[in-house]
Each structure stands twice: as C-alpha cells, then as structure tokens.
Amino acid sequence: MPMDSVAITVRKLHPSGLAAIVALGVALAVSLPAAAAGDAKGSVIYKTRTADLKYAYLVKGPDAVSKQTIRRLILSANDVSAKIAACKTMSCTDSDLTEGLSVNFDSGPRLNYWMVLNGQKIQYSGTLKPEVLKTTADDAKRMAGKFVFDDTASGGPKVDVTFDAALVKELSAP
C-alpha cells in the first residue's frame, strides 16, 4: 500500500476510533509485565576471572525440587530483562545468566547460590549462611542490600556487591 493511502486513511479516522486505538495501546502497555533491571554494583571473582555485576532482578516461584515458593536474586553483568520477562517457569529465570550469580532464598536455613562466568563455561554452586547478606530492604516486592562472601577456601568465588532489586516476575511453574 502506498504511503499516501496510509496517511489519508489515518486522517479520515473518526476521533472516537482514534481514541479507542490510543486507549487500547495504553492498556496493553500497562498490562504487560516489565522485567526492569534493578541496580547492582560490585563483582564476582573466581580464580583468575572477574565479572562486574551491574543488574539485579528478584523473581518468585516454586523451587524445582521441593516445589516450595522461593525468591531468587539474580545478579548479572549483562541485562537479561527480556529473557526473564519471557520466562514461563522458575527454572528459566537464570538459564540465560552467562556472567553472574543467582541466589535462592526461603528454601531452608542456608542460601543456595550458583555462579557462572565465561558464558556458563565456568560454574560453581554452594551454600552460605544467611549472615553474608545485609539487607536494607526485604519484603515481598523488593530486596536491597549488600552481599559479601569469600568461598575461595572451598574452591568457590569471592563476591562483594551492593544491589537493589524489585520483584520483576512471579511464576507458578517450577
């Protein structure tokens, strides 16, 4: 269709029709969940590799094993907002994490974490005492604070990061 035809059609649109289109667009924009990244500032160091953490996300859903509802903090060097927004399952939320750390809360007396570097070619999992996290905000919709630990004695990473993560996704499937 030539561009002139499109312009003529738009000009001939009745004002109430244009208002309906605008209202529909606004309704869609408001109803779509946005996985906007929170801020993170710090690093994860593992042997000779370092990742600068810049993005923080908080997601909520069932644990893959226990099916118990947990919160997962994802700290990443790269923006994975679009990937998290597209997730239908909890296990998907950190599957595209290539440089960073995910930490599971509410699943027991210790924090479970998974560190990845170099496009997931380097991975390390461990557990930590909850005391390594000092929160300044911790409720159903937001977690903020400082996360510092040194797991190098066990062959793991050293992490020092300050973050502020809003809840970006709630899931019902593990």
Model segments located where?
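Surface-exposed helix/loop patches within compact recognition domains
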Residues: D63-A140
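Bacterial N-terminal signal peptides
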Residues: A19-S31
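Amphipathic hydrophobic-ligand
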Residues: R49-T50, Q123-K129, P157-T162
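A short hydrophobic beta-strand element
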Residues: D139-F147
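Bacterial N-terminal signal peptides that target proteins for export
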Residues: D4-V22
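Edge beta-strand at a domain terminus
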Residues: G38-D39, S43, K146-P174
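Charge-rich, low-complexity N-terminal segments
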Residues: A37-L58
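Sec/Tat signal peptide C-region and signal peptidase I cleavage site
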Residues: L32-A36
